[in-house]
Amino acid sequence: GRSTVAALLSAGVTRDPPEPVAPESPDTPSSAASSLTDGLTFADNGVPAQTTAPTSSKGYTVVNGVYLKNSSGTELDADALSDGSFAAQLTDDGPQVLIVHSHGSEAYTMPAGQEYTPTGSFRTDNDACNVVRVGDEIAAALSERGISVLHDRTLHDVPDYNDAYPHSLASVEDYMEKYPSLVFVLDVHRDAVSDADGNQYKLVSAEEPHAAQMSFIMGNAYDGWQE
């Protein structure tokens, strides 16, 4: 179980990554379950929705409507980023994408009647209400498109939040060693946005159907970072 994994990692013992399998649990959709919005109903969780967009492109590299905030000192070529070609190639030779969660217990504000039992500030080990569920949906969507996915559902921030990144790094290194076919590693987190008065907002796109806004954080201190 996850408590056993956490104990092993805390003791400095690495685990052997499992074989790639479709996510399975009562709270986990199968890869066949997604047309991801078909038949879903959405309850208001009481957090006001807000669409945010930069009012100026100053300080950003803009690529096809995506705003890249570049604090690295490396100049980005918008034309090269938008030409549709990538050095990374996905093949059928093995798992291609690894999804992990350094902070797997990061949770979401639930509608009335669906509240979770908290295990920390805006955190829960209930995988139906934390960021692991988001990883399930990403894995299902990629699998539908023929991309082989591994989803590590370990709560690396349980029991000790401060050890989350060393634990998740150890997991990623284990997976990379066992599955050299992996091309992308996604460490999926939940963000939180609030105004100057501390009021929380959920960020959605203005277009229908509404969709949550996402950000990708990428370092450039390694080869292939633009892929």
Where are these regions (language model features)?
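Catalytic-site microenvironment of enzymes
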Residues: 1-185, 190-227
